[in-house]
Amino acid sequence: MATQCYDPENSASRYTLLPDQPDSGHRKSLKIISGIFLSVFLLLSVAFFPILNNQSPDLQIDSRSPAPPSRGVSQGVSDKTFRDVAGASHVSYAWSNAMLSWQRTAYHFQPQKNWMNDPNGPLYHKGWYHLFYQYNPDSAIWGNITWGHAVSKDLIHWLYLPFAMVPDQWYDINGVWTGSATILPDGQIMMLYTGDTDDYVQVQNLAYPANLSDPLLLDWVKFKGNPVLVPPPGIGVKDFRDPTTAWTGPQNGQWLLTIGSKIGKTGVALVYETSNFTSFKLLDGVLHAVPGTGMWECVDFYPVSTKKTNGLDTSYNGPGVKHVLKASLDDNKQDHYAIGTYDLGKNKWTPDNPELDCGIGLRLDYGKYYASKTFYDPKKERRVLWGWIGETDSESADLQKGWASVQSIPRTVLYDKKTGTHLLQWPVEEIESLRVGDPTVKQVDLQPGSIELLRVDSAAELDIEASFEVDKVALQGIIEADHVGFSCSTSGGAASRGILGPFGVIVIADQTLSELTPVYFYISKGADGRAETHFCADQTRSSEAPGVGKQVYGSSVPVLDGEKHSMRLLVDHSIVESFAQGGRTVITSRIYPTKAVNGAARLFVFNNATGASVTASVKIWSLESANIQSFPLQDL
């Protein structure tokens, strides 16, 4: 389909004018800013039971140069090679092609091949959901970062489109990095993104659709005045990235946005104001800062309703609203968030609970999940969250299988009215369209130390809802419970038995349980003497292969009076997304089984507690594959 470049002179009454708009045409080359102009910018930037034996999990642990250093330091994405605590790479495993083929997911979004990382600029436009993503078109390892592009009618079935942006200008020649979309009231789309310049300086750039009437947004124009932002004095040239979606400021026609950075070891969110997205003013102070959290990247900032169950547009503010601040911590590759109050006039966000401040309190996901990004979906009035699920195997294994990383299933995000401290994340309702037939329903009484096989047609693609009722007499005896100060990550996994746990579900296991991934609850005695519930995912025996991540992930999760212990699991071959208590605590597992593959995968429920009986109620749906393929552009 031939498209024409959006012409502001003929559309001024409909769309926001962009200064110095290029003439019509497909991806026309932009004028390169002069060396003097670049120099000025750079000068400004300077200033169980017997079968579950106890095994310890493996632990994972600025000057210009001719080539960039490790991407975990300079590019703001995770180092790929999995390393142990000594820093040495693990020995590669002799993967068969059948094993590697089985690892590829059936209903999670991923490109046909090669490397992918952060989700970028998600939006809804003219009947289509758009997802852009960091992509290497040349290899299954990080490099040559380009913006991949895909569209969907339902967030589940996807169609690949041509690249939206490639690194072809001096200001993004070393990578078209992460960015966000802002949709103006008149429909114009402003896409701000970070570019890595020919001198390895992180700058912010503007792009916009060539033709807003095109539902697929096939062609994008880079503003010829790029970069629109360079690192301000006091900010490192490699510590200035990932602009957020903008929100309306206190003055009419004013927009605000935040960009992550650091000052020393303090993570900060800088705030800029603009009226046209081509010129910006850095506001005094910062939106928020937390000492000791290091570089903040992929910052997200959005409102949530404390009264209603719908999502809110990014600019919404007023009574009954809290604001979520999320930062992806470059130092440990974890996504942290906090809920607080935003003072628009003072440009300050304050956490409701300083002990749960951003970077030191709650995490969006306690597993392999990073660089998340939300957007407001006007079609269904919801806030939708994307996140990157990376790899923990070796680069050689990724090169052998020809791809690396997937995106999480999109999640809705709501404020948890019951706790007032947590968000509730839940898979978008469209995932249920993949359910095949009626669920398998089981109710199982589990005595201490017991395990039971649940027979399903295929254990590789499942949607599981499970609730557990613990013997009330045992719960009342919590004063006798052990493991005060229990932690999932240091507990020894599901093989570590206590009076009131662990109990839960075992997924992607083989018949002999030589490979298994338990997802479970563990009730311990808190520091106040009351029951404290933990939600964990144990990967210590998820694979017999060396050189892959085998941590125990998890955290505490509030279980309120009258609530059963409940979980939902989405199993998709080598990915398990686990949601506890309606999504208060979430864990994403990336596993690499060698035996529990194809028809050998099994599903179990278990109770490895020593002093409590548990009744498990389970619903299991088999899921069919999503349709993810190239868009038939020749049919347009």
UniProtKB/Swiss-Prot annotation:
Gene3D superfamilies reported in the protein's UniProt record: Exo-inulinase, domain 1, Glycosyl hydrolase domain, family 43
A Pfam family hit: INV_N
Prosequence residues removed at maturation: 1-92
Active site per the UniProt annotation: D118
Protein name: Acid beta-fructofuranosidase
Residues that bind substrate: W115, M116, N117, D118, Q134, W142, W177, T178, R241, D242, E297, D330
Lumenal compartment spans: 53-636
Metabolic or biological pathway, per its Swiss-Prot or TrEMBL entry: Glycan biosynthesis; sucrose metabolism
Similarity section: Belongs to the glycosyl hydrolase 32 family.
Record: glycosylation sites: N144, N211, N276, N608
Keywords of this entry: Disulfide bond, Glycoprotein, Glycosidase, Hydrolase, Membrane, Signal-anchor, Transmembrane, Transmembrane helix, Vacuole, Zymogen
Topology class, membrane: Single-pass type II membrane protein
GO CC annotation terms, alphabetical: membrane; vacuolar lumen
SUPFAM superfamilies recorded: Arabinanase/levansucrase/invertase, Concanavalin A-like lectins/glucanases
Lineage of the organism: Eukaryota, Viridiplantae, Streptophyta, Embryophyta, Tracheophyta
Location within or outside the cell: Membrane; Vacuole; Vacuole lumen
Primary localization class, coarse: membrane
